[in-house]
Amino acid sequence: MLTRVDHVGIVVPSWEEGRRLLLDQFGFAINEARTRLPEGNYYAPGNTRIYFVRIGGGETNVEVLVPQDSVSGIAQFLHKRGPGLHHICYASDALEEDARILVERGLERILPGSGDVNPESAPFFHPRAALGILTEVVRDRGRR
């Protein structure tokens, strides 16, 4: 079952811009349990740096995606749409079962080889079947 919103992914041109908004202006804190500091987590297939920012009590995070080149999927997204919302991610206590149910209910799973996503670790669903929202589902790790 989908249990909660795990994170919301945003794309920014630099960590400094994301940090300024989320930490300095909103007053949130970096989620040190999920972020390798100071350089952020590196996602090689997408050539992207990733930082997790904890919202309030910490059950939901903002995943800040910073492209490291101009040709990756995240970089192309930034170039085409500018900084902002990239995806929403729900936590699941039965990941593969929930992914199967979502497909049965009409969502379109993004398959391997479709851009920068890695659906083997976390299924993604195409925006065209979800009100224009790229959707990800991850295993519920609890409060981290």
Can you name each region flagged by the protein language model?
Residues E32-L37, G73-H79:
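Short, tandemly repeated low-complexity microdomains enriched for cysteine and small residues
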Residues G18-L23, L102:
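Conserved active-site tyrosine of GNAT-family acetyltransferases
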Residues A29-I30, T60-N61, S72-G73, A130-I133:
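Short loop/beta submotifs within extracellular cysteine-rich repeat domains
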Residues A29-G57, H126:
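N-terminal strand-loop-strand beta-hairpin
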Residues V5-P13, F52-T60, V66, D69, A75-R144, ...:
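Vicinal oxygen chelate
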Residues G27-G40, E104-S114:
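Short secondary-structure junctions
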